[in-house]
């Protein structure tokens, strides 16, 4: 841990971890909620190396660190064991989220922990299918059987794995979730479905179901829950409510075993009798609906999903499609959804390859190599956030190329038959179980090649502005300083009134401890980039951001005072961390009226955090400025 000693000292002098209710951080400071602020040694903390100052505001004990606060926070949380408290704080902050965002968060939290292993077992299953279709192995071969068991294991017992992650997400005991999932795939109950039913319910309807056993005289509809998704998630949610209720009424002395005892006795039978059948029917209807939409126009569906897939990834919306894809595999035996988006990652790396070949900026060129390599294996985040999205045009072009690839996949009606690996390791996922390399498989191959080539050619021809492909010597000159009076101008990011830092009612800024600069009282809720450079920090609540200019100046712009408490309300970001921006680009919009109505000032410090690298810093003498006017001038 990089800041281990500092973290230990901070915990000690805020009164020890037992005095900490919770700790979160904003862009510059740790924000503690303490049981007793009187136990904190404020004077000691203020004089500590690595701490700028200490402040008390809004019921929080704030330890100002600086731009590296996320790293210090990580060590404080780990050493103090505050993870659960931090998670609780995050849940409180989610009160402003909409239902859709909550749904995406739930899906992501449940599936993310198992995706790595799911992809790995899928790769094994895909390679095994490839060996079978090419005649390398036969079904009766022991090697094939063992590889099949490894590859199919997680998917078959999916309810057990999801029982753990879903229970953890919903606040239940994870092992109770696993036990519920294990009950759903218990071999004896699975075998019973192969025998003669006692009778049949809902005869003649789409819900017709044979009954093989009863529970206390109540008919139990045994369904195939192997590989299923929806039943265990709903069961885990129900279990979390039951367990929470039981914990309130069962005495502590017997709580350890009686809570899971009664939870399982209540939840498992109800899952088999009610939750499981309803969830399974819902899954079947969802699968039929997805297939109906797809059949309306596979080409248009492929172009739409393929073209917007990387956009979905950026906003986390792709998590909403993954359960649908898995459900399709369970219900239909194949899935078109993940097939239609498969070419998107290859469109990305095609664009990245063109950027690497043409761009002269060494920083971006260096990023392109690892981004390309990771993209080959389906991990596109480095390509998106490090290369194509900051440059804008390559990202748009990659989406267009992915749309073409998706349309081709729709044309061939390609399907996925397993949840396989990513990138090149995902190709065997599209081998037909019976026909092997059928037309659908070759449709995937053609789409991948077309998406890559199209992304490469269009990016090479149209993807880079002339400034981004300029001579490398220009960039080198911009980053070097001989100490002979080289100047750099920082423009105003707002329209508004200029005030000095010393007038700000926040010691961390007014003292100059975080850096030298100036402050603005914005008259319009729009923040424009004051320089050309990179967004090196963007706090999740969008109230503050850091920008490093092309010439190396590090700026911190903090909209308002203590506005982190608004949890992102009234702020809208038009950029992301890692984005390359030009002077005058709109970065953030904010509602001045609503922020003030909530009781917060919008006075905004604009500071140079690495001001010590400069010999002089000149401030504007204007009292009113417009966005784009000269605000600061730095001289080395």
UniProtKB/Swiss-Prot annotation:
EC number: 2.7.1.-
PTS EIIC type-1 domain sequence ranges: 105-476
UniProt keyword Metal-binding present: no
Domain PTS EIIA type-1: 506-610
Cell location: Cell membrane
Pfam families, sorted: PTS_EIIA_1 (PF00358), PTS_EIIB (PF00367), PTS_EIIC (PF02378)
Keyword hit for Methyltransferase: no
GO cellular component, one term: plasma membrane
MF-aspect GO terms: kinase activity; protein-N(PI)-phosphohistidine-sugar phosphotransferase activity; protein-phosphocysteine-trehalose phosphotransferase system transporter activity
UniProt xrefs under InterPro entries: Dup_hybrid_motif (IPR011055), Glu_permease_IIB (IPR036878), PTrfase_EIIB_Cys (IPR018113), PTS_EIIA_1_perm (IPR001127), PTS_EIIC (IPR003352), PTS_EIIC_1 (IPR013013), PTS_IIABC_b_glu (IPR011297), PTS_IIB_1 (IPR001996)
Location of the region described as Disordered in the Swiss-Prot/TrEMBL record: 472-492
GO BP terms, alphabetized: phosphoenolpyruvate-dependent sugar phosphotransferase system; trehalose transport
Root EC class: transferase
Membrane topology of the entry: Multi-pass membrane protein
Chief location of this protein within or outside the cell: membrane
Catalytic machinery residues: 26 (phosphocysteine intermediate), 558 (tele-phosphohistidine intermediate)
Residue ranges of every copy of the PTS EIIB type-1 domain listed in the record: 1-86
Highest taxon listed in the record's lineage: Bacteria
Domain notes: The EIIB domain is phosphorylated by phospho-EIIA on a cysteinyl or histidyl residue, depending on the transported sugar. Then, it transfers the phosphoryl group to the sugar substrate concomitantly with the sugar uptake processed by the EIIC domain.
Role summary: The phosphoenolpyruvate-dependent sugar phosphotransferase system (sugar PTS), a major carbohydrate active -transport system, catalyzes the phosphorylation of incoming sugar substrates concomitantly with their translocation across the cell membrane. This system is involved in beta-glucoside transport.
Name of the featured protein: PTS system beta-glucoside-specific EIIBCA component
Source taxonomy: Bacteria, Bacillati, Bacillota, Bacilli, Bacillales
